[in-house]
């Protein structure tokens, strides 16, 4: 079993690495704020909207359906992220991997049908 001094000696390079990483990342975040010139004007503080004047305030409320569509997009985007490696390694993972992905797709399909029946996709 290692004694305390030997244990500290083995972890010293890792501690030094984390210390330097924290120092460098802190400097990268702080130095631009200290060294940059700050010129505030009305045009720089306005939101950009395709070259036109903004029609309304950028911080207006959105309909909840936009959030539901965004969440559904993320869920099905992650489904593709799981399907591609699964399809590539299908011959190596065997029947267990095949049926586990079929179960995963079944659960996602049930969730999609539920969202559809609840009217989350109706506008």
Curated annotation (Swiss-Prot):
Keywords of the record: Cell inner membrane, Cell membrane, Membrane, NAD, Quinone, Translocase, Transmembrane, Transmembrane helix, Transport, Ubiquinone
UniProt KW Transmembrane helix keyword: yes
Pfam family, one: Oxidored_q4
Assembly information from the UniProt record: NDH-1 is composed of 14 different subunits. Subunits NuoA, H, J, K, L, M, N constitute the membrane sector of the complex.
Function summary: NDH-1 shuttles electrons from NADH, via FMN and iron-sulfur (Fe-S) centers, to quinones in the respiratory chain. The immediate electron acceptor for the enzyme in this species is believed to be ubiquinone. Couples the redox reaction to proton translocation (for every two electrons transferred, four hydrogen ions are translocated across the cytoplasmic membrane), and thus conserves the redox energy in a proton gradient.
Catalytic activity, as annotated: a quinone + NADH + 5 H(+)(in) = a quinol + NAD(+) + 4 H(+)(out)
One Gene Ontology cellular component annotation held by this UniProt entry: plasma membrane
PANTHER family for this protein: NADH-UBIQUINONE OXIDOREDUCTASE CHAIN 3 (PTHR11058:SF9)
Transmembrane segments: 11-31, 68-88, 93-113
The species this protein was found in: Rickettsia felis (strain ATCC VR-1525 / URRWXCal2)
Subcellular location: Cell inner membrane
Membrane topology reported for the UniProt record: Multi-pass membrane protein
Family statement drawn from the similarity comment of this UniProt entry: Belongs to the complex I subunit 3 family.
One GO MF term attached to the UniProt entry: quinone binding
Annotated EC: 7.1.1.-
This protein's record includes keyword Signal: no
This protein's name: NADH-quinone oxidoreductase subunit A
Enzyme class: translocase
Origin superkingdom: Bacteria
